[in-house]
UniProtKB/Swiss-Prot annotation:
Keywords: Ribonucleoprotein, Ribosomal protein, RNA-binding, rRNA-binding
Function per UniProt: This protein binds to 23S rRNA in the presence of protein L20.
GO molecular function: rRNA binding; structural constituent of ribosome
Name by which UniProt lists this protein: Large ribosomal subunit protein bL21
Gene designation per UniProt: rplU
Organism expressing this protein natively: Xylella fastidiosa (strain Temecula1 / ATCC 700964)
Family under the similarity heading: Belongs to the bacterial ribosomal protein bL21 family.
Amino acid sequence: MYAVLVTGGKQYRVVQGETLRVEKLDVETGGDVTFNSVLLMGGSDGIHVGEALKDASVTAKVVAHGRARKVRIIKFRRRKHHMKHQGHRQYYTEIQITGISGPAKQ
């Protein structure tokens, strides 16, 4: 069974046992988090699609918090001998999917 969930403004296709990096979540390492905004679920009983499936959720365990690789930004003005350097490291949370519960059978 797989599901498509929304977190941090992005959509992720997940299966049970998968580990992935999402935008930073305010949950302690080792804690559990539940995602209720599930857009699609698929499995042996067919595909369920909806704007936000009712009674569908994905549970995950927080494995670690961290920061991604540095993105370097350089702003340059030609012929003016002007250059500006800037860097950014995005925070992320690494989660492991522990369970996917589907909507009620109709």
